[in-house]
Amino acid sequence: LLINGGFMFLSALLSYIYKDGITGDLIISGTIVSITGLLMLFLNKNHDKQINKREGYLVVVLGWVIMIFSGTIPYLLTGTIEGFSNIFFETTSGYTATGATIINDVEILPEGILFWRSITHWLGGMGMIVFAIAILPLLGIGGMQLFSAESPGPSTDKLHPRITDTAKRLWLIYVSYTVIETIFLQFAGMSFFDAINHSMSNIASGGFSTKNASLGHWNSNPMIQYIVII
């Protein structure tokens, strides 16, 4: 929830820069989600921080469900998508990096919502559990059980002995590739806003775009398509 809330505030910043009229709604969204996350953290601070494998599976399932439901709040408060079922579908599609959408005209959406939409792709692409493994030790909570629940295969004691460091390196690579692609797309002719959104979507192997025609909007510029393919 704290991760979601932080990125909602980042979306609010983009909204303020582009003056799309929904900055306040995004700030409220981030505040609600962040306070809820802090409250849950406070209520559980005295509980046993070591979790077994069964609890690890439960945390993985509930983690995804909570992330998706909290991710619907910006859509609900801004009123950019009608109907909770449509909002839930769009949010789930984002976090699962599916790329399916119920929005007929994405170009009329405010920049803050388009950015939040791409953020859900980006977070879901690497996997929130991998991100959690990287930061849970900072809170004094073990992450190996989450890794066991999220990743089928050999037992974790046969894998990298420092799984937290591995998760951090994965995210460093993920962020680096996103930044590099954003820069390349800008050099190829995209605006910064379009470049960062398409980079997050592409790195996550998703399909969300800021244009109705997606990359077809830049058919006259094959360099953009080459960058995305590479």
Walk through the language-model features, giving the residues of each.
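Membrane-proximal intracellular helices of multi-pass ion channels
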Residues: 1-230
